[in-house]
UniProtKB/Swiss-Prot annotation:
Stored CDD domains: SQCY_1
UniProt GO molecular function: beta-amyrin synthase activity; intramolecular transferase activity
Residue numbers annotated as active site: D485 (proton donor)
Enzyme class: isomerase
PROSITE patterns (UniProt xref): TERPENE_SYNTHASES (PS01074)
Keyword Repeat: yes
Family: Belongs to the terpene cyclase/mutase family.
Name of this protein: Friedelin synthase
Functional summary from the UniProt entry: Oxidosqualene cyclase that generates friedelin, a triterpenoid product with the maximum number of rearrangements possible. Friedelin is probably required to coat the leaf exterior as defense compound against pathogens or herbivores.
Free-text tissue specificity from the UniProt record: Expressed only in the epidermal cells on both sides of the leaf and not in internal leaf tissues.
Annotated catalysed reactions: (S)-2,3-epoxysqualene = friedelin
Source species taxonomy: Eukaryota, Viridiplantae, Streptophyta, Embryophyta, Tracheophyta
PFTB repeat extents: 148-189, 640-681
GO process annotations (BP): triterpenoid biosynthetic process
Length: 767
């Protein structure tokens, strides 16, 4: 049976940590764990997911939950409540539902204080890792038979009905998703006609029916070239010489969004080396299976710009293709021949590897994300197959695995801090401190231990990095990459804890470390008042014309986001109340400019585009709460009025809200099919309206939403998993499995606190 291990480093001599592995979560298969009741529950969960896989795509993340609830012998002692038709929401009902949710999810807290959860969904994370391990000869070392079984399960369970696989689990079939998962199945031992429900042959048919693997997007062409399944001449150039350009040039990698920079750094190294793995009999078979014509007859030059229409979200501008053609026809032939291959190319490759090693070391070999991790690991192996750099990479591979009832998948890199900071705020809003003292104290300790204590090593600015001391990451401290919203949410938690008795929640974070966090936030704010995610924004927008991907938008440079801006405004408003003299003018200016940014980016219909959640509902919650924190109200701010009207206009008959992920790529509000409600989105809308003062005007929409949340709660205090709620870069969904608990609990807590308990619809219990 699979078991989730918390804050363990194991005995691997090549792994190291900055905080004793707080937040680390790894899965191990325990052959001795054979409890028949637990095994039966796991098998039932798998079967239930399989039977409903085309209706509810994200997992309910049940394996670790079953484990933790069993280990803690959790029993729900508060009776389930329902609000009947025509009945008003009572104080007792709201309180009971809230307490049931809090007790249930508190029981799922890990030993180090964080809340584990799946954070996955893209269908292009696992295959590159499998290819990398196949190339390096470590596939059988890392992938046990149990790893193979669960990885294949995930692929089978997320195959679309037409035989293909999507860019992400909610999406239509794409060439990128289908080719990568096809290769993954074959490398893991499936034959050409193998796989559950004829998965392999159905996938191959989809590929060939849609033009074959030469129509895969550019990232796919790179991996196929590495695998010997395409020729490098079928790829657009990724010259490592970009790293030799003067940093003041607009197209220098230093100007890129960090994820873009971190993807093309190892890609450019592998391209510059023209690395291709040893051609095995299996690769020769795959050449025959994936292409519509014999491999040696393919005109690779003609397929460089070919991309399957199902994959194309961001078509390349003509200008970009002209640039690639110029590099392809003139620059690359020169740089790959003597003497420039010695004078320039080798120097560029060394410079690129210097940056790779720097980034690896400063993330403890976790690297910034799943895509980048595998590319950097392969680059280290290509440089030195027996070197310590590669061995350190191998030691951190388990950090990316996640196992649920739908199988094994690769996480983005983990949402440990993000989920924990949100749930802490939900707990504090519940006003249940006396019942959850231990839970709060452990969470407080985890958040304090997860703060980044130092900037990147050495002369970090010369490595195109920025300050991180005082920040929080998305996952854990070892990851190292600062994030503005994660920093703001962590700061909010620490400030709220500082208002509580230390004998209850532990010692408050020292003011100096709070000041470090404030420094990060002040450093990152843009001139327009908005907040970027990772690094300062402000580079020229025209650089987005050079976006080399076909399936993402706005990935070349850093941008400002409504969510990051709101989180930072909320955090600094609270900080200003508690530390009114610290950098007072800067903090006040930040809040003023941040609020103005939130007003300025509002859409004409009153909505805000959410960048990291689905979508306009998510953006509206953040914007309205941020504006409220800055002193903007329904009466004094037109943006608040328009935002409230937007949410009220899309409320559904059952009192909920339900928005399709399709809103994200379409950039317009798209309701869920059949006007279904989604509990997570209902919670966002409910909180947004409450912070906008809706309870003082007409609480009826709030009571209707609360009724839906209360009536949807399950018998044990959990909430049902519904449609995916997370997204990134407009076109790829991301499953935050913790959201289905965090946000309904938080919304009920805020509802109970701010919807006047003496009103007609929600009343205090009679004495």
């Amino acid at each position: 049976m699979w078991k989730l291990k918390i804050a363990e480093g194991g005995s691997d001599p090549y792994i190291y940590t900055t905080n004793n592995f707080v937040g680390r979560q790894i899965w191990e298969f325990d052959p001795q764990a054979t409890d028949p009741q637990q095994l039966a529950k796991v098998e039932a969960a798998r079967l239930n997911f399989y039977n409903h896989r085309h209706k509810i795509k994200p997992s309910s993340d049940l394996l670790w939950r079953l484990q933790f609830l069993e280990e803690k012998d959790f029993r729900q002692n508060i009776a389930q409540v329902k609000v009947e038709d025509g009945e008003e929401v009572s104080y007792e009902a709201a309180t009971a539902a809230l307490k049931r949710g809090v007790h249930f999810y508190s029981a799922l807290q890990a030993s180090d204080g964080h809340w584990p959860a799946e954070n996955a969904g893209p269908m292009f994370f696992m295959s590159p890792l499998v290819m990398c391990l196949y190339i390096t000869g470590h596939l059988n070392t890392i992938f046990t038979e149990e790893h193979r079984r669960e990885t294949l399960r995930y692929i089978y369970y997320h195959q679309n009905e037409d035989g293909g696989w999507g860019f992400h689990i909610e999406g239509q079939s794409t060439m990128f998703g289908t080719v990568l998962n096809y290769i993954c199945m074959r490398l893991l031992g499936e034959g050409p006609e193998g796989g559950q429900d004829n998965a392999v042959s159905r996938g191959r048919k989809w590929i060939l029916d849609h033009g074959g693997a030469t129509a895969i997007p550019s990232w796919g062409k790179t991996w196929l070239s590495i695998m010997g399944l395409c020729d490098w001449s079928g790829c657009n150039p990724m010259p490592p010489e970009f790293w030799l350009l003067p940093s003041y040039l607009p197209m220098h990698p230093a100007k890129m969004w960090c994820y873009c920079r971190m993807v093309y750094m190892p890609m450019s190294y592998l391209y510059g080396k023209r690395f291709t793995t040893h051609i095995t009999p299996l690769i020769l078979q795959l050449r025959e299976e994936l292409h519509t014509q014999p491999y040696d007859q393919i005109n690779w030059k003609k397929v460089r710009h070919v991309c399957c229409k199902e994959d194309t979200y961001y078509p390349h501008p003509i200008l970009q293709d002209l640039i690639w053609d110029t590099l392809y026809l003139t620059t690359e032939p020169l740089l790959t021949r003597w003497p420039l291959n010695k004078l320039i190319r080798e120097r560029a490759l060394k410079k690129t590897m210097k940056h790779i090693h720097y980034e690896d070391e400063n993330s403890r070999y976790i690297v910034i994300g799943a895509v980048e991790k595998v590319l950097c690991m392969l680059a280290c192996w290509v440089e030195d197959p027996n070197g310590d750099y590669f061995k350190k990479h191998l030691a951190r591979v388990p950090d990316y695995f996640w196992v649920a009832e739908d199988g094994m998948k690769i996480q983005s890199f983990g949402s440990q801090h993000w989920d924990t900071a949100f749930f802490v705020q939900a707990l504090l809003a519940s006003d249940m401190t006396d019942e959850i003292r231990t839970t709060l104290a452990k969470a407080h300790d985890c958040i304090k231990k997860s703060q980044v204590k130092d900037n990147p090593s050495g002369d970090f600015r010369s490595m195109y990095r920025h300050i991180s001391k005082g920040a929080w990451t998305f996952s854990d401290q070892d990851h190292g990459w600062q994030l503005s919203d994660c920093t703001a949410e962590g700061l909010k938690c620490c400030l709220l804890f500082s208002l509580m008795q230390p004998e209850v929640v532990g010692e408050a974070m020292p003011p100096e470390r709070l000041y470090d966090s404030v420094n990060v936030l002040l450093y990152l704010q843009s001139k327009n008042g908005g907040m970027p995610g990772w690094e300062p924004a402000g580079e020229s927008e025209w650089l987005e014309l050079l976006n080399p991907t076909e399936f993402f938008e706005n990935i070349v440079i850093e941008h400002e986001y409504v969510e990051c801006t709101s989180s930072a405004v909320q955090a600094l408003v609270l900080f200003k109340k508690l530390y009114p003299l610290h950098r007072r003018k800067e903090v006040e200016r930040f809040i003023t400019n941040g609020a103005k940014y939130l007003e300025d980016i509002q859409m004409p219909d009153g909505s805000w585009y959410g960048n990291w959640g689905v979508c306009f509902t998510y953006g509206a919650w953040f914007a309205l709460e941020g504006l409220s924190a800055a002193g903007k109200t329904y009466n004094n701010c037109a943006a608040v009025r328009k935002g409230v009207d937007f949410l009220l206009n899309i409320q559904l008959e059952d009192g909920g809200w339900g928005e399709s992920y399709q809103s994200c790529p379409d950039k317009k509000y798209v309701p869920l099919e059949d006007n279904r409600s989604n509990l997570v989105q209902t919670s966002w809308a409910l909180m947004g309206l409450i912070y906008a003062g809706q309870a003082d005007r007409d609480p009826t929409p709030l009571h209707r939403a609360a009724k839906l949340l209360i009536n949807s709660q399950l018998e044990d205090g959990d909430f049902p998993q519904q449609e995916i709620a997370g997204v990134f870069k407009m076109n790829c969904t991301l499953h935050f499995a913790a959201y289905r608990n965090i946000f309904p609990i938080w919304a009920l807590a805020v509802y109970r606190r701010f919807c006047n308990p003496n009103s007609e619809a929600i009343s205090k219990p009679s004495k």
